[in-house]
Amino acid sequence: RSLVSSEWTVRLGSVDVVSVGKSEQRFITSVIRVHPNYNSSSNENDIALIKLHDPAKLNNYVSTICLPDQDSGELYENGNLCHVAGWGSDRVYPVYPLSSLTLPIVSNRQCNTFDEFSVTDKMLCAGRQDGIDTCSGDGGSALMCNSSKGFVAVGINSVGEGCGKSKHGVYSDVRHYLDWIKVQLFS
């Protein structure tokens, strides 16, 4: 399923959502592909890919991120510390500039014990029980774990309950979508 892409603008290298910085690059999109089995009720298959109309210029503010591979299992271990960034709300108010958090991976079993969401094997959880979490506006942000080959996008921020309510955030597990991603890249 594709969305009308001409209505979307992508900003790369931006650290402030309300003003344009000298490091910012803006692009119109040529294609936005939503996973064909996305289910808005369960948030299963909550992943989409965006193709830019023109190529981005890689620099100190814009770079690529690695995808997980067969050797990435340790990144998904319970307690492994990963990072997420976004302009989501800070409990109530939007955050400017871009903010980031370090969050531990939480096992799906533990996540299903404490949270109301049904976390499937295509999802993963991260977060702390002290009220530090992603919030409204952070959806779609990458959950990034550091590895020997650089940062790896292990998850995509999908769903959570409120802001800072001692609940885990639920992410689409990128490992389960690698074949779909490859097909989209070459189609």
Where does each model-flagged region fall?
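Extracellular "complement/coagulation-type" protease architecture
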Residues: R1-S187
